[in-house]
Amino acid sequence: ISELSQQFGLAVGNVFHAGDGNMHPLILYDANKPGDLETCEAFGAEILKLCVEVGGCLTGEHGVGVEKRDLMNVQFGPMDLEAQMWLKDVFDPKWLLNAAKVFPLESAQAHRAAQLAAE
């Protein structure tokens, strides 16, 4: 993460749950500086990819959310995501809970279109 911090030119404060290995890197950026938010988002995505690469996962107790949803395919293949969407169909058939906050938008839209066409 320190190397990525240098690469992206943004400072990061690493906060962890010492007992279970959860990381909460706090990337510091200036919202008033053009391009800093986009750089911060790219930096965050690289941290998540690195986590998966070394055997971790995209998220822990805080869920996926809009920040991580389009990176779900970094950790899960198409069949895994389809199985997860099938479970969502069972427990949330109208997809009202956490709408557009769990699955990559492209995959979720295709799944929902197929589901609605079948109704």
Across the structure, where does each feature detected by a protein language model lie?
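Conserved glycine-rich FAD pyrophosphate-binding loop
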Residues: 1-119
